[in-house]
Amino acid sequence: RRREPPFQFWSRIKGLAMSHLMNTYARLPVAFSHGDGSWVTDTDGKIYLDALSGIAVSTLGHNHPELVAAIAAQAGRLLHTSNLYRMPQQEQLADKLTALAGMDEVFFCNSGCEANEAAIKLARFYGHQHGVDSPAIIVMEKAFHGRTMATLSATGNRKTQAGFEPLVSGFVRVPYNDLD
């Protein structure tokens, strides 16, 4: 028996129109229209504390005037180019980050998933460069790493992985706080 997707269930319960978005998350029955700082407002005007600060790539909260102005100013000059070209602002930021972190280089990503995917590749590359034929990467049980094939394979949730087998091998799962 096929289970009804969660959004269809809530649409039926709340009388919401079905969305044309692919149902990849079990969405909650709330729609946000705007935010300010750590607060978000839904389409009914109810205000919530956003304890996640916008989650993932928006960790600075919502609608900060200086950030909005900086984004608008940059969008008015140049929004994005390929990494095939040099970008002075990107290089200036890389200089600052490497100085602060005491590192030699940085790798800018569009998402946490892309960052995790790059970390997996770098770890495997390092292993191969040091004579390890099948490098293994330690990941935490029940952790979420992303939805690409490699990051999904690293994710410690069988429910999230179901239906996408065969998964990428080379991950060793350990429980949190187990230092042995």
Stretches found by the model and what they are:
Residues 32, 63, 89, 174-177:
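Short secondary-structure boundary/capping elements
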Residues 13-36, 53, 84:
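Active-site-adjacent loop/helix segments that line or gate small-molecule/cofactor pockets in enzymes
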Residues 95-180:
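PLP-dependent aspartate aminotransferase-fold enzymes
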